[in-house]
Amino acid sequence: MSQPVTPRRTTRSSASASPSPAPASPTSPPKSRPKPSPRRQLLAAAAAPPKEDGSSADALLAELPGRRAQAMDILRLLAPAPALPLMLHGGAATGKTRALLLALRYLRPSQRLVYAALRSLPSPRALFASLLSQLSATPFSTSSRHRVPDKPSDFVAALRDALNGIVSQGEVVYLVFDNLEVVRSWDKGGQLLPLLLRLHDLLQLPQVVLVYVSSATPDAYYSMTGSVEPNYVYFPDYTVDEVRDILMHDHPNPKLYSSFLSVALKPLFRVTRRVDELSAVLEPLFRRYCEPLGDLKAVPDEGMKRRLFEHVQSHLAVALNETFNVPMRASMDEIKDGGSAGKGSAKRQFAGKDGLSSELEFHMSVSAKYLLLSAFLASRNPATLDAALFDSTGGLDNRKRKRKSSQASMHMKDTIVEEMLMKGPGTFPLERLLAIFQCITSVSEDILDEIDCPGNMASESGTTGLMSDVLLQLSTLCNSNFLSKSRSCPLEGSARYRSNIDEDLALKVARSVNFPLSKYMYRR
């Protein structure tokens, strides 16, 4: 008679006390389990007891090609138990989370990891529940006796109580907030973000180390609260040699894969430097590359390398055109000429005088582009000239009707221009920005009405149908540091803004929407 199998919901202690189940029958197929993601594997490894071998630092550096300096900085800043907060920042897919979790794995003291993947959490309440559940023996939910705090002050109190119980046992707790920039997109995220950055001051627990991982720059989180500033570790983009080392790591046939990367990596690296995107594209290409081979463990000679290259060359061109398709929009000149499509138009766009920068589409809505141009004009032009620049007769085209300026007035204009250059971009209220925005968008609509667009191409290109929620676009531009917002003026009682872009970028944005920006810029 076979022994009973341990039920699924049996606790860990009862399962260890129960007799071991009988071995599975040879005829019964094994149950397939989903393969855990690399990040879950790293989390499990980081939560495991630290290794005691003397080569742990060397093993860590071997697991992180191209990140030796960053790994050493993380170990140096996190190794002592009472450590200041740490922020890892850099572009996407630059190895920030992997370097952190592997470094925590090799830390010597007894430590406990509390990890919050903010990209997978939809709200502050879900974040509170995730952190408190990892620190508590019983999960926090609305149905249990442990209720999730709704207020940030209640959350800080509950978090302090949970951490006190762990710290009192001599453990070091590492609180990791991954993808910190996601908090800004949450409801009331602007209030939660300063709270998370001030947890070191609010908790007052030396054995609790806070680590923030962000794809945004530290300037995006600057606040004047007087809290302790974290230590920063910057992760730059990978070089082509570093990407090659990462892709070659633990490959079963390094010589064959090296010959493949020498053909396919550099063309793809010119388009993207993200390791995850490159890995996703290179995997099917490598299968195509190996199709002429009968044995995948064979080492190709020079003649075989040439034959493999000729076989994969056409597939590599398809991968460049399909996988990394750069979004573009037909210019108004092409609409006037009747439009053009196909490979010929793509070649003309990429072979321009200014290169890619003059033809690539900006990753923002059309209304945001017009709002950015309005802010640039409001910062550059004096407010007293708005009526003359944005009149119904076409702006500065009516200079012929002006009487000749005297020597004194010309000298005064020169003085005003010099003062403007010394002061830099000026500030402006919201009312003036909206007035200029309304004027230049109406000018754009008049230009579109004069062009006979076949097949309604203008509407497809996104030039018409401007978004009505201008305030939301304004907030996005401020968060992206295209605009700066100052405090409310004590006299006017409203906030003032300032444009942070230069004339070259403004002209590129204007060309992308076919707006005559130079016509509305004040020049001496």
Curated annotation (Swiss-Prot):
Localization of this protein: Nucleus
Gene Ontology terms: biological process: DNA replication initiation; response to sucrose
Start-end of Pro residues biased regions: 20-31
Superkingdom per UniProt: Eukaryota
Induction: Reduced expression upon sucrose depletion-mediated cell proliferation arrest, and accumulates after sucrose treatment.
A GO term for molecular function: ATP binding
Residues that bind ATP: G90, G91, A92, A93, T94, G95, K96, T97
One GO term describing the cellular component: nuclear origin of replication recognition complex
Pfam families, per database record: AAA_16, ORC5_C, ORC5_lid
Keyword Oxidoreductase: no
Region of interest: Disordered: 1-56
Expression across tissues: Expressed at low levels in the shoot apical meristem (SAM), leaves, ears and roots.
Keyword tags: ATP-binding, DNA replication, Nucleotide-binding, Nucleus
Biased composition annotated in UniProt, kind: Low complexity: 1-19, 39-49
SUPFAM superfamilies named among the record's database cross-references: P-loop containing nucleoside triphosphate hydrolases (SSF52540)
Quaternary structure annotation from Swiss-Prot or TrEMBL: Component of the origin recognition complex (ORC) composed of at least ORC1, ORC2, ORC3, ORC4, ORC5 and ORC6. ORC is regulated in a cell-cycle and development dependent manner. It is sequentially assembled at the exit from anaphase of mitosis and disassembled as cells enter S phase.
Functional note: Component of the origin recognition complex (ORC) that binds origins of replication. DNA-binding is ATP-dependent. The specific DNA sequences that define origins of replication have not been identified yet. ORC is required to assemble the pre-replication complex necessary to initiate DNA replication.
Similarity comment: family membership: Belongs to the ORC5 family.
Protein name: Origin of replication complex subunit 1
Lineage: Eukaryota, Viridiplantae, Streptophyta, Embryophyta, Tracheophyta
Gene: ORC5
